[in-house]
């Protein structure tokens, strides 16, 4: 019997969606590298708009945690409110209406809470999940690291924003490549990942 073909995790604009999770005002001073991860998520949002990739945005209990931060650039998106530590219940109808959907690109906070639970729910639906590691964080770097390892153990792909952007555009001949090139000309800001990944880190091996 032939071995099962591994899932490669390719992303294409026509079968992908971008999830933006809970980047809200009250988290601003508590989440590690908050400005940096919001900046990267904003870059992903701009690319999604250029490539016509659908985008969904959630807010966790906005009455207490405030609105989405303006620097995300999410004007025109209608946030879906939730209290569940997963985006999926709030987005169920949107997911059901997209039978062509294969890949979810996931940005936001917190890694060990809503990002992890969203990932598990999406994997349970048979979707491929690409966690944008430079656009996800937690209050604690330990929680962030263990959550990334946990998601990888469960079958999610850990990807950088630039890696996913270049997969989505696919070709320097793409009509939007010049605009996208301007967005990635400067490297994504440091969000503390190097210290998590360097050395003999058993959680990510």
Curated annotation (Swiss-Prot):
It comes from Macaca fascicularis. The gene is ISOC2. Its main location: cytoplasm. Belongs to the isochorismatase family. Interacts with CDKN2A. It is found in: Cytoplasm; Nucleus. Signal peptide: none annotated. This is Isochorismatase domain-containing protein 2. Keywords: Cytoplasm, Nucleus. Pfam families: Isochorismatase.
């Amino acid at each position: 019997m032939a071995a099962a073909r591994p899932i490669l995790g390719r992303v294409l604009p026509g079968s992908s969606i971008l999830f933006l999770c809970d980047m809200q005002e009250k988290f601003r001073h508590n989440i590690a590298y908050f400005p940096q991860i919001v900046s990267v998520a904003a870059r992903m949002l701009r690319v999604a708009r250029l490539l016509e990739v659908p985008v969904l945005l959630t807010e966790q209990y906005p009455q207490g945690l405030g609105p989405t931060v303006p620097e995300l650039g999410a004007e025109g998106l209608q946030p879906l409110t939730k209290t569940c530590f997963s985006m999926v219940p709030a987005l169920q109808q949107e997911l059901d209406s997209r039978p062509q959907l294969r890949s979810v690109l996931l940005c936001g906070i917190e890694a060990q809470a809503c990002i992890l639970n969203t990932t598990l729910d999406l994997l349970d639906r048979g979707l491929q999940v690409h966690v944008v590691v430079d656009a996800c964080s937690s209050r604690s770097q330990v929680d962030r690291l263990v959550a990334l390892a946990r998601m990888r153990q469960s079958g999610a792909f850990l990807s950088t924003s630039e890696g996913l952007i270049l997969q989505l555009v696919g070709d320097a001949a793409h009509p939007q490549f010049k605009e996208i090139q301007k967005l990635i000309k400067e490297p994504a800001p440091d969000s503390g990942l190097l210290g998590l990944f360097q050395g003999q880190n058993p959680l990510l091996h």
